[in-house]
Each structure stands twice: as C-alpha cells, then as structure tokens.
Amino acid sequence: MIIVISPAKSQNFEPIKTAYQFTQPIFKQQIIKLINTLKYYEVEEIEKLMKISPKLAEEVFAKHNSFNPNKYDNSNAKAAIFTFSGDVYKGLEADTLDNKTIEYAQNHLLMLSGLYGLVRPLDLIQAYRLEMGTNIKIDGKILHKYWQDKITTQLNEYFSQQQNKILINLASNEYSQAIDKKSLAVKWLDIDFKENKAGAYKTIGIHAKKARGLMTRYILENRIENVSDIKKFNVAGYQFNPDFSDENLLCFTR
C-alpha cells in the first residue's frame, strides 16, 4: 500500500535535529531540464506565469537561480517530509513521528511535485515553487502530462515490491492527474472529507487538506495495510460514512 499526497507551496528549511539516511531525488535528469527552463524566466514573467505578487516573484526568481541540480546535501537541501509545511503537513506533523514511522513512510508515502515528480519522505529537496497546474510546457507537453508516464512507471515499479497493491490517493486533483490511472497496475482508492454545514455535507478545502494529513499520519503510525482498517479512522471528529462511499471512494464526515 502506498499513499500519495500533494506538496506544499510553503516550505521550512530550518535544520532538523534527528539524523536519518537521506536519499537523493528520483528524477534528477528531469529536474535539471525543468529548473533550467525556469531559470529563463525573468521576475515579471514569473509574476504572470504563477499569478503571484512582484515581491514573491522576486523570491521565486532567487530560489530558482540559486538552485543547484547537481548537489543535494544538508548545506542546500532538506528531507521533503520535514520541508513542506502547508495544511496537509500541519495534519501530518512529521516532526513528531518517531524514527521507525519515518522509515516506514519512506516505503509507503510519496509526494507529488511539479518540479521533482515523485518525492520520497527522506529525499533531499531544495527550495522551489512550481505547482503542477502551472501553464508551462516541457517537451511540448503541459506539466502534468510531461510527468504522467514517468510517475506512473515509477509507481508501478514501487508497487512490484509491495504486498498490498492499493494506491491511497490523498492528493488534490491538480496533482493526482499526474498519474495515469489506466496504466497503473494496482487498485486506486480516493479518500474524501466532508463537513456538515446546515444539514448538508460539503468538502471544505482547508479542512480537507488538514484531514488528508491526519489520515496519512494515521495510516503510517498504525502500519495499515488494508481498506477495512482505514475505515476505522476516527480523528478530529471524522468518521467513515458509507452513504457517500463506494468501492473506489472512502468518505469521512463530521
């Protein structure tokens, strides 16, 4: 069983205290091609491309132009699971997971990324900003199409080493579309979270993102390897709701 989640635009590069066996990014050649493309963009072009403020565009320009795709170590990079710090990662709280759970996560959790493609928890990453939905073409393909074959092939390879061949999709649609479901040789299971608002259940972005992190943590800490145990998730008031679920979707409501 492998979980996939989205990355986060917010990143924290404060050093971590615990020593781990860090790993290198999976798609180094593709990263070189992408970062070299991004380095062509001036500040004003980044502002328009990414629809961000002039100040943020300057920061992104600096990040990409100081990016060294041939060097990933503790001087310029940090393990991905401790670097991303958006809403999903607030739910995950990776810095409070014990060493054995982090090691387990290395084989059961993958983060999708516009720049890195697929990222394992202990892969070293440098600061960047490139959302999967960014309107940029690489080799004549939009970004998620550029990554699709590469990511799907790599996932199938990882699943060949897994006993339970289920992909738990906790990523957003923007990122999960970078996986070709038709070419994925395993079962695909979506998970959704809904809130009861005035008698109607709705998916609310900020709550759903944090819940994805909570679910990721729950699966990793409990070493869950089957769907029936996922249904037992009962954190932050969420409970499995069969009325909104089917064989390809588990929905949790509160």
From Swiss-Prot:
InterPro entries, sorted: YaaA
Domain of life of the native organism: Bacteria
Pfam families xref list: H2O2_YaaD
An individual GO BP term: response to hydroperoxide
GO (cellular component) term, any one: cytosol
Entry-linked PANTHER family: PEROXIDE STRESS RESISTANCE PROTEIN YAAA, PEROXIDE STRESS RESPONSE PROTEIN YAAA
Family designation: Belongs to the UPF0246 family.
Protein name: UPF0246 protein FTT_1693c
Organism: Francisella tularensis subsp. tularensis (strain SCHU S4 / Schu 4)
